[in-house]
């Protein structure tokens, strides 16, 4: 969405309702500004006359907020995001921290943005497709801005020794296939890096000599 310069003297020539429910303001300069109808109504700005500095500033702020929210919804349409992730991406594109914060609050209130839902989907995907242990998953969630309390609560739903042992054994077999010679100490270290507990690693390596820790 191209950035439109809105300054004192700008004139709104025409207002068009869009199929999305938004409106397009056609400016005399040839530029187009998009807003939500309720926002435009609240601004109560005149048409066909030049806006003064205060009016132009109000329109510019509203247009900036609309652009932030539009980009946020576009990103969320591609995949779930944590609040932290979405804030970081918006900060790369926009220089208005207040507009970004207001946008995130609005999206959370309307249910478009949810750290809990993001974390649930993240865990579902990781557990279905990767052989990582719970400590690795906990760290990855925290790296994405999820609180430790929420991450641990959701991971507790997968608190199954059988699940983690199965994943550790698959990870072990993959490591052994890739390396011609792997000693027990190295194998233990690699599985530890994948986020498995000592007890799970010991069970997965039960047929091998145990390393001295």
Predicted regions and their residues:
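An alpha-helical, amphipathic repeat domain used for nucleic-acid recognition
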Residues: 1-213
